Design a protein with these regions (language model features):
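Extended beta-strand/beta-hairpin segments
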Residues: 1-53, 60-141
């Protein structure tokens, strides 16, 4: 198996502070994040969008594997993961993730596609990691 890493730096307080996110691959290298990008829609990244990107990528790769096992190959798949962060008690929690998949898969019928997409949603490693409500809207186009 593999082990990889991501890292974060932070300077200052919660509202005036500035952070930087990096990944081992270099895909992100000191990319800015902070309170304003997380809660006020300002430029920069935030943990929730990174979790969304990771979940969308993991789910889509898992579905590719599951499709292959069913002798199907996607011509194209596009997945979006909407991650909801809500205030709970004294803190915050990710309360749900909604996956939206649009896929072009020659030879797939909707019933089989829905079954395989559901397996990918339940079985991808990021889904297994997350302790939240995960929903899926999968469409063949």
């Amino acid at each position: 198996m593999t082990t990889t890493s991501g890292s974060a730096k932070w300077q200052g307080g919660i509202k005036d502070g500035k952070g930087a996110i990096s990944t081992k691959s270099g895909a992100l290298n000191d990319y800015p994040y902070g309170f304003a990008s997380r809660f006020e829609g300002k430029a920069g990244s935030n943990p929730e969008e990174l979790i969304g990107a990771a979940h969308a990528a993991c789910f889509t790769m898992a579905l590719s594997l599951i499709l292959g096992e069913a002798k199907l190959t996607a011509e194209q798949m596009e997945t979006r993961a909407d991650v909801t962060l809500e205030k709970q008690g004294d803190g915050f929690a990710i309360t749900s993730i909604h996956l939206t998949l649009n896929a072009k898969i020659p030879g797939a019928d909707d019933a089989k596609f829905q079954e395989l997409a559901g397996k990918a949603k339940a079985g991808c490693p990021v889904s297994k990691l997350l302790n939240t409500n995960i929903t899926l809207d999968a469409k063949l186009v």
